[in-house]
Amino acid sequence: MENKSIPQATSPLAAWLSYLENLHSKTIDMGLERVSQVAARLDVLKPAPFVFTVAGTNGKGTTCRTLESVLMAAGYKVGVYSSPHLVRYTERVRVQNSELPESAHTASFAEIEAARGEISLTYFEYGTLSALWLFKQAQLDVVILEVGLGGRLDATNMVDADVAVVTSIALDHVDWLGPDRESIGREKAGIFRANKPAVVGEPDMPHTIADVANEKGARLLRRGVDWNYEVKDNGWRFSDARGALDNLPLPQVPQPNAATALAALRASGLAVSEQAIRDGIQSAILPGRFQIVSESPRLILDVAHNPHAAAYLAGRLKSLSKTGRVLAVIGMLHDKDIGGTLACMESVVDSWYCAPLEGPRGATAEQLMEHLGKGAIYSSVAQAWHAAMADAKPEDTVLVCGSFHTVAHVMEAMDAGRTGGE
């Protein structure tokens, strides 16, 4: 697959992304040997003085965002690498909560292309190296890496984390990570390091996580054992070995993820004031995570795509003050647990608007309908969303969920509507 015409530092980002997508024989190729060799050549294995690495089935993005928000409130210069993106590739790398220009990414890709020689890299490995290179150039205090898939063999794990975080463990990506929570837990705990904090937000922790912590000599900090949180009427309380923080502001991200981020921050030893914690928690929001875009009708975007996330989403919907119906625009990938995910939502959704997702992994609208037995079929996510918005009364809620791709399509349709495009 080599010898395609190689883009240059000044080539458009789209040309580079097309090149990267076709560079390696496999889309996913787990293992650290190839990517670590290139990282060593680029000298990016220590992208900042302090690194957090965040793994987990759900909640990684909002945990990273909370860490970023609090650390910035405390005066640190912070970089975050996350995936997948919703609308633009540049979302994947944030420096001080801002995306970098496309030209920065293409310059970085050119550096990696020059350094890799004959070593073949996947799209994700290339992107990870690029993020590390960009962070190194930015001279940051802290870098936060969101694991792409699993942990042990994920490209992010070539970097030694000063604090490792596992947010939650549920069944997803079983083809790659194993058939049960124990196998998945072992893979995710692969990011742990000797004598470093390993913070686990999953309340029902598989024993394999403790096994790996013991094998590696990591300092395991478990929710409900070493730290905990409790939601009160108008705030919440966090407690760990260092003491308690009372009357914290309720976060806009899921509560367990804000608490897990706080546990990781307090385990890090980084100087962070209580005021920075309060300010950072309040300002942390992330697109596509129970994102309320508008009211009358209320429009909510959520990337929930497995039963664990869908159950949380259903609970959030039940807690909203509402009098009208919930109209759900749904599109999913066929390798997800479609039946289990939809079953978690059925009690809170009144009408389903089923749409296909394109590409080899996309489920058809008909496949979704097989599980639901009711609803309407549309030819695209945008068409389903337009139909739901047209049907919605001011008191209703339109929910868009099922995949990052589904939410991205609606965001793009909203942008097109604002700019008068198609």
In which residue ranges do the predicted regions lie?
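Nucleotide phosphate-binding/pyrophosphate-handling subdomain across enzymes
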Residues: 48-50, 137, 142-147, 154-165, ...
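Active-site-proximal loop/hinge segments that shape catalytic or ion-binding/gating pockets
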Residues: 403
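ATP-dependent carboxylate-amine ligase catalytic core
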Residues: 7-8, 12, 26-28, 32-49, ...
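Extended acidic/charged loop-beta regions that coordinate divalent cations
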Residues: 84, 88, 127-176, 207-244
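A conserved segment at the C-terminal end of the G1
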Residues: 50-54, 62-79
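C-terminal helical cap/extension that packs against the catalytic core
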Residues: 199, 203-217, 232-235, 266, ...
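Membrane-proximal helix-turn-helix segments that form the acceptor-binding/catalytic region
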Residues: 185-194
